[in-house]
Amino acid sequence: MKPPKVGILLMEGTNNETEVFFSVRRSGGDPDYVHVSDIAAGRKAISDYDALIVPGGFSAGDYIRAGVIFAARLLAVAGKEIRDFVDSGRPLIGICNGFQVIMEMGLIGKRDELTLTNNESGRFECRYTYITMTSDNPIFRDAFKGKGSFQVPVAHAEGRIAVSGVSVLKRLYENDQVLFKYSDTHGVTDEYPWNPNGSVDSIASLTNEHGNVIGLMPHPERIYYSYQAMYDDARKDQATGKLFYDSLISYLSGVHG
């Protein structure tokens, strides 16, 4: 059986594509860089992949606001193809700036109800924190559900998840869209700096209603090996990133293999 093919979407300013590429490869997938210009020129097609990942960075220099230019370019050259990809049930994952991109594209929720905005601290937050899985998402359930807190690095200035009202937040929970929450070593907490940006309800990661479009602010690809972790986590057999990417490739192999 061929390894699952994972497209890594790029444009000028993305800068975490290499870490994502090698994380996918080390976990048994077949990664491929897909520049937005390759899609526009017809050299590569969204439909060729089993999963898509939009990596972190500062796409288009984050001019106007984080992720909006990359989102506009993707919608212009492959809007229908990406919608069809998502409707097929295949995973689309946005990490940090990639999360901002897919939020701008409206792939997780309505933009007038749900947004990523400036950190409460008013500055770029770059540190380690922890996340705890809070949904029953089948892609990551076996590795993360009910197994405590997992160390992850964050690095962003516009990572605060905000909702337009209590009804929107309630609907996210009803639809099981809250994938991970910020935590300390004891469990979910809203306290800074563990919640580095002030996200509502300490939410670190969201999905669409079907669970296959996934956005997260932490960077699992930056903690693939235990030696990249800090404190007691450096002595764990498997780091968070390996668990994350192993889960993705295992899911793809079972469902779309």
UniProtKB/Swiss-Prot annotation:
A GO term from the CC aspect: cytoplasm
The Glutamine amidotransferase type-1 domain, residue ranges: 6-237
CDD domains: GATase1_FGAR_AT
Record note on quaternary structure: Part of the FGAM synthase complex composed of 1 PurL, 1 PurQ and 2 PurS subunits.
Enzyme nomenclature, EC number: 6.3.5.3, 3.5.1.2
Domain of life: Archaea
Pathway: Purine metabolism; IMP biosynthesis via de novo pathway; 5-amino-1-(5-phospho-D-ribosyl)imidazole from N(2)-formyl-N(1)-(5-phospho-D-ribosyl)glycinamide: step 1/2
Coiled-coil portions: none
InterPro entries: Class_I_gatase-like, PRibForGlyAmidine_synth_PurQ
Task performed by this protein: Part of the phosphoribosylformylglycinamidine synthase complex involved in the purines biosynthetic pathway. Catalyzes the ATP-dependent conversion of formylglycinamide ribonucleotide (FGAR) and glutamine to yield formylglycinamidine ribonucleotide (FGAM) and glutamate. The FGAM synthase complex is composed of three subunits. PurQ produces an ammonia molecule by converting glutamine to glutamate. PurL transfers the ammonia molecule to FGAR to form FGAM in an ATP-dependent manner.
Keywords assigned by UniProt, alphabetized: ATP-binding, Cytoplasm, Glutamine amidotransferase, Hydrolase, Ligase, Nucleotide-binding, Purine biosynthesis
Full protein name: Phosphoribosylformylglycinamidine synthase subunit PurQ
Gene3D superfamilies assigned to the protein according to its UniProt record, in alphabetical order: 3.40.50.880
Active site residues per record: C96, H219, E221
Catalytic activity as recorded in UniProt: N(2)-formyl-N(1)-(5-phospho-beta-D-ribosyl)glycinamide + L-glutamine + ATP + H2O = 2-formamido-N(1)-(5-O-phospho-beta-D-ribosyl)acetamidine + L-glutamate + ADP + phosphate + H(+); L-glutamine + H2O = L-glutamate + NH4(+)
UniProt GO MF annotations: ATP binding; glutaminase activity; phosphoribosylformylglycinamidine synthase activity
Location in or out of the cell: Cytoplasm
Biological process (GO), any one: 'de novo' IMP biosynthetic process
